């Protein structure tokens, strides 16, 4: 239903995230529905590319699909600290499997602003994997969920990326468990939902411009 309405709502691309999307045993069917119409990206930790899920992944149409795989560092230390012991080796194996299987892969790291050396080592690993710059994403830590530090997010400070969950519509997927970022309960009709978010975003920008120009000194 979401994909059907997105066709007429000026949607340009679809991202599927979680949790872990590959825990859905029928994800391949959902992906094939989405990729027929939109460029589609799945955000995954690549840790469950085994058994039946691996077989189903191999049957997914590679056209219009990107697997965005989380890898926070070039060695297990930091990544495993974030995501659990042994997760680095599984993620790296998943990245290599996806590349070898002909999928477009983007690798994403969540790092603090002071992660200079870690970031350099991470980029070196991406070089070894022959990933281009547009196949690499570095996101800063947001003060959301279990994080006790990081960038503070609000609807006024964050460019919206409409996020639909079973609980409702959120301003952005990075804050999809934050009550203050929840826009409304129902996503349908999607075109109206997107219009509501655009209108609020415009108001935030107008207010920001007014504040920015309130004290001219030159």
Question: Residue ranges of each PLM-predicted region?
Answer:
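Generic detector of well-ordered alpha-helical segments enriched in charged/polar residues
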Residues: 58, 76, 80, 119-123, ...
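A short, N-terminal amphipathic alpha-helix
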Residues: 2-9
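Canonical radical SAM enzyme core domain
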Residues: 1, 19-61, 71-77, 81, ...
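A broadly tuned preference for mixed-charge, low-complexity surface segments
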Residues: 68-76, 91-100, 124, 156-166, ...
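Accessory C-terminal segments flanking Radical SAM cores
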Residues: 141-218
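Short C-terminal domain-edge/linker segments immediately following a structured domain
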Residues: 45-47, 71-74, 96-104, 137-140, ...
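Conserved C-terminal portion of the radical SAM core fold
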Residues: 9-15, 37-41, 64-68, 86-148, ...
């Amino acid at each position: 239903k979401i994909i059907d309405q997105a066709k007429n709502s000026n949607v340009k691309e679809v991202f599927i995230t979680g949790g872990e999307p590959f825990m859905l045993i029928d994800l391949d069917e959902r992906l094939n529905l989405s990729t027929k119409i939109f460029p589609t990206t799945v955000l995954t930790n690549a840790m469950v590319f085994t058994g039946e899920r691996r077989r189903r992944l191999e049957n997914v149409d590679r056209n219009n699909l990107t697997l965005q795989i989380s890898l926070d560092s070039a060695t297990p230390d930091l990544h495993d600290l974030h995501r659990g012991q042994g997760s680095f080796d599984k993620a790296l194996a998943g990245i290599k499997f996806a590349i070898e299987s002909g999928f477009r892969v983007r690798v994403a790291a969540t790092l603090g602003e002071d992660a200079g050396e870690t970031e350099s080592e991470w980029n070196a690993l991406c070089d070894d994997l022959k990933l281009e710059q547009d196949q690499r994403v570095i996101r800063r830590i947001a003060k959301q969920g279990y994080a006790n530090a990081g960038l503070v997010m609000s609807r006024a400070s964050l460019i919206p990326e409409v996020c639909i969950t079973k609980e409702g519509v959120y301003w952005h997927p990075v804050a999809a468990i934050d009550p203050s970022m929840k826009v409304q309960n129902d996503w349908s009709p999607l075109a109206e939902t997107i219009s509501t978010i655009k209108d609020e975003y415009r108001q935030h920008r107008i207010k920001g411009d007014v504040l920015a120009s309130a004290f001219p000194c030159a």
